[in-house]
């Protein structure tokens, strides 16, 4: 049998064909850490006794979870990263003011490219599969070993193929597609497998693809990955500062399952507490009152997400019982929102706009929920206590549904506020 797209990339890295289930050691193209995971990795790296990192250009350190620093402990965490980067001459350390949410920032800076093998000490490292590379989350000890050796080990995953057909309806986006898929297969439906997306992928923008790949981990997947096409090429062009290689799956590649996803049939989706698989069509939600709306994150903080929110919020007001928080994912996105007038309209509507941070998504800072409060968020997880008090609730949706709901005061379709 032939090789899947993920297996093709891994095979090229070790110089022979791999098969599902075998353990392999692979050279990595990028090693990523943030202000939660990198300090642990740095301490482990120092225990190894290496004088230098394997390659100062292939490590990215991005403080994003608790920045700007929310307290003394978070400030100390970032300082560990800062000192380590300076000591080892690490090129890709992104200080406050230059930083962004890591999984939006690295593609934007051209640090992850088609055909790469990327590991990150963050579970949503799978985001970069939108660019036809193998990217996956690891623990801090694996990050430490990779910083020292430039290598990581994996069990080669089996794969599930998702064949996309049709086109997206108005107000339906990549977030709705991945919520629909997770609702269909469950949070363990792709456990340690590669989710490979093919078919009519041209119906999805690159931002849609980032969103879908980002949430592959919410189905338990090892990685998510899209075919390379002209949309991928257009995004990478002008960002890539080195050569990259494009891979294609074999026609006779073996998949554990194959799903056909008809995009025409997907309506806006909402994931109810406390799992991303608890999805319902917007038409089945009922009248769910909300206290807070969050638009942003590594899942939905890109420019197209901001544009959708702008189109819905322009000339309208946030409901008096709702707090709307908007987080552009990078400084570049933030600046473009300023230039286009999005920020002005957000503020006029009654939203609070923040510098890039992961803060509210993980219940870290800048948007914590109190007991009994209910949030609708464009983030990727809605576990118990994810955004604050254990007795709060988090619902997940697209930016379109989130913006519309901020106006209405309860979860609604964008069609209801047009």
UniProtKB/Swiss-Prot annotation:
Annotated residues for binding of [4Fe-4S] cluster: 298, 358, 361
Protein's pathway: Amino-acid biosynthesis; L-leucine biosynthesis; L-leucine from 3-methyl-2-oxobutanoate: step 2/4
InterPro entries (alphabetical): Acnase/IPM_dHydase_lsu_aba_1/3 (IPR015931), Acoase/IPM_deHydtase_lsu_aba (IPR001030), Aconitase_4Fe-4S_BS (IPR018136), Aconitase_4Fe-4S_dom (IPR036008), HAcnase/IPMdehydase_lsu_prok (IPR011826), Homoacnase/IPMdehydase_lsu (IPR006251), IPM_dehydratase_rel_enz (IPR050067), IPMI_cat (IPR033941)
Keyword terms, alphabetized: 4Fe-4S, Amino-acid biosynthesis, Branched-chain amino acid biosynthesis, Iron, Iron-sulfur, Leucine biosynthesis, Lyase, Metal-binding
One Pfam family this sequence matches: Aconitase
Cofactor note: Binds 1 [4Fe-4S] cluster per subunit.
Keyword Transferase set for record: no
Cofactors: [4Fe-4S] cluster
Biological process, per Gene Ontology: L-leucine biosynthetic process
EC number: 4.2.1.33
Family, as annotated: Belongs to the aconitase/IPM isomerase family. LeuC type 2 subfamily.
PANTHER family: 3-ISOPROPYLMALATE DEHYDRATASE LARGE SUBUNIT 2 (PTHR43822:SF16), HOMOACONITASE, MITOCHONDRIAL-RELATED (PTHR43822)
Name of the molecule in the record: 3-isopropylmalate dehydratase large subunit
Organism: Thermoanaerobacter sp. (strain X514)
């Amino acid at each position: 049998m032939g090789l899947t797209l993920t297996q093709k990339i891994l095979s090229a890295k070790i110089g022979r064909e791999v098969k599902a289930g075998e353990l392999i050691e692979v050279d990595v193209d990028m090693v990523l850490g943030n202000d939660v995971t990198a300090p642990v990795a740095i301490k482990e790296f120092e225990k190894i006794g290496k004088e230098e990192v394997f390659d100062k250009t292939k490590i990215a350190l991005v403080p994003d979870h608790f920045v700007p620093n929310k307290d003394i402990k978070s400030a100390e965490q970032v300082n560990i990263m800062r000192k380590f980067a300076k000591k080892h001459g690490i090129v890709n350390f992104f200080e406050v003011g230059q930083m962004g949410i890591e999984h939006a920032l690295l593609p934007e800076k051209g640090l992850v490219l088609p055909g790469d093998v990327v590991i990150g000490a963050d579970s949503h490292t799978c985001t970069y599969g939108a660019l036809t590379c193998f990217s996956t989350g690891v623990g801090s000890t694996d990050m430490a070993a990779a910083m020292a050796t430039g290598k990581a080990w994996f069990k080669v995953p089996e794969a599930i193929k998702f064949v996309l057909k049709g086109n997206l309806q108005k107000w339906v986006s990549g977030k709705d597609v991945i919520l629909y898929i997770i609702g269909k297969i469950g949070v363990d439906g792709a456990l340690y497998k590669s989710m490979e997306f093919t078919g009519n992928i041209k119906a999805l923008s690159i931002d849609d693809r980032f969103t879908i790949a980002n949430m592959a981990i919410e189905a338990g997947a090892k990685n998510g990955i899209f075919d390379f096409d002209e949309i991928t090429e257009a995004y990478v062009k002008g960002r890539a500062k080195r050569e990259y290689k494009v891979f294609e799956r074999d026609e006779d590649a073996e998949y554990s399952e194959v799903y056909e996803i008809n995009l025409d049939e997907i309506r806006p989706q909402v994931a109810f507490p406390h799992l991303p698989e608890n999805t319902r069509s917007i038409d089945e939600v009922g009248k769910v009152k909300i206290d807070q709306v969050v638009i942003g994150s590594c899942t939905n903080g890109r420019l197209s997400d901001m544009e959708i929110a702008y189109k819905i919020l322009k000339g309208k007001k946030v409901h008096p019982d709702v707090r709307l928080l908007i987080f552009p994912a990078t400084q570049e996105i933030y600046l473009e929102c300023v230039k286009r007038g999005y920020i002005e309209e957000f503020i006029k509507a009654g939203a609070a706009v923040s510098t890039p941070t992961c803060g509210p998504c993980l219940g870290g800072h800048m948007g914590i929920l109190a007991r009994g409060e209910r949030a609708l968020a464009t983030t990727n997880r809605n576990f118990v206590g994810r955004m604050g008090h254990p007795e709060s609730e988090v619902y997940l949706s697209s930016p379109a549904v989130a913006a519309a709901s901020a106006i209405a005061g309860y979860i609604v379709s964008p069609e209801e506020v047009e």
